[in-house]
Amino acid sequence: MALWGGRFTQAADQRFKQFNDSLRFDYRLAEQDIVGSVAWSKALVTVGVLTADEQRQLEEALNVLLEEVRANPQQILQSDAEDIHSWVEGKLIDKVGQLGKKLHTGRSRNDQVATDLKLWCKETVRELLTANRQLQSALVETAQANQDAVMPGYTHLQRAQPVTFAHWCLAYVEMLARDESRLQDTLKRLDVSPLGCGALAGTAYEIDREQLAGWLGFASATRNSLDSVSDRDHVLELLSDAAIGMVHLSRFAEDLIFFNSGEAGFVELSDRVTSGSSLMPQKKNPDALELIRGKCGRVQGALTGMMMTLKGLPLAYNKDMQEDKEGLFDALDTWLDCLHMAALVLDGIQVKRPRCQDAAQQGYANATELADYLVAKGVPFREAHHIVGEAVVEAIRQGKPLEALPLADLQKFSRVIGDDVYPILSLQSCLDKRAAKGGVSPLQVAQAINDAKARLAL
């Protein structure tokens, strides 16, 4: 039976019912709806709507229902109830009879669903934070194991300067740390309870909403009933967090797809996260990474869709807001799955050090070192830049790296170049000189690993 049937003399068209019903997706809020109902029953005792004995009966029945839901959540989908609130109330009435009809006193589905969704978001944020830190930890461990793996760093997808695989790993640790911070900030803002705001104007019962918020584990109660039932900022924030986080994971995936390619050959992925071809027996495809990259788009779409849904809504609640859940559920599920999968990809990855080092020695990645050498000899940087550019052209013409050019050839471009230039052009020197904080020098990378381990309690 619908919760609102008294006003109507005709039954809803079955096509409208299917269009209107939300149980097929909001069943995921069942546990939160039951927990919220237990807290509401306690609040009704404080204003004399329920006796202590009635509340006890309701709480016992709701707790039984909670265990039934946890044991078999799919049972909910066998119902033709309109939404999860209708389903919970119907099941409660089945268990306690007419007493169950008293529970909704002073409460609206508007503040009820807003509360349920915030409770769900809080739990999901904690899961995301755990998965995020697990991936950070996996990156730090991979970095620690590959501090000596020298590889080319890229700009414009062209070899630029030598870095290490460890330094690359730590770059993504930084991105994930920002994702973690955003989630923590979002959690602070959504940690306010809308329960007790009614449909839009507040409840007619003098319920202590701060006490009610505390029972539900919220930091406080919201301040304005109109805003409370129509606020979906936390949905937008979480979708934004997910969109940014998935961009980071997509870039991570793209880097490793390239590193794993035959053209680069810097890493080999485990068989556990790759697949083959139905036609070409030799193929070993990085499907896990490609799916992470591909799933980024659906999360961006969820954020854009929700913004467009909310942008023209008048205060307060509108049924448009029912559209908040499917996109949110899918986006956060996707982000969580991708965090877990990225960590799995790192488990068993093999870094091919000789190939990485060979690539780092190609492409004149030490050209900047020669320019810095000239600057140290008193040549203005802009002039040094031009000199080195000419030297690179000559090295390309001869088919040699810079460090293989004879001194006489180098001195054609600048007489200040001496025998002391050759140690400067080594890969190790290139790394050692980047010793400022955040640089790629072995000492800085080791310090960054230690700092990350301390922050993550590894």
From Swiss-Prot:
- Source organism phylogeny: Bacteria, Pseudomonadati, Pseudomonadota, Gammaproteobacteria, Enterobacterales
Q: Where in the cell is it found?
A: Cytoplasm
Q: Which family does it belong to?
A: Belongs to the lyase 1 family. Argininosuccinate lyase subfamily.
HAMAP family in UniProt: Arg_succ_lyase (MF_00006)
- A GO biological-process term: arginine biosynthetic process via ornithine
The reactions it catalyses are:
2-(N(omega)-L-arginino)succinate = fumarate + L-arginine
Q: Which organism is it from?
A: Salmonella newport (strain SL254)
NCBIfam families found in the cross-reference section? argH, PRK12308.1
Cross-referenced InterPro entries: Arg_succ_lyase_C, Argininosuccinate_lyase, Fumarase/histidase_N, Fumarate_lyase_CS, Fumarate_lyase_fam, Fumarate_lyase_N, L-Aspartase-like
Cited Pfam families: ASL_C2, Lyase_1
The identity of this protein, by name, is Argininosuccinate lyase
Which GO terms fall under molecular function for this chain's record?
argininosuccinate lyase activity
As recorded in UniProt, its EC number(s) are 4.3.2.1
This protein's pathway reads: Amino-acid biosynthesis; L-arginine biosynthesis; L-arginine from L-ornithine and carbamoyl phosphate: step 3/3
Q: Is the keyword Amino-acid biosynthesis in the record?
A: yes
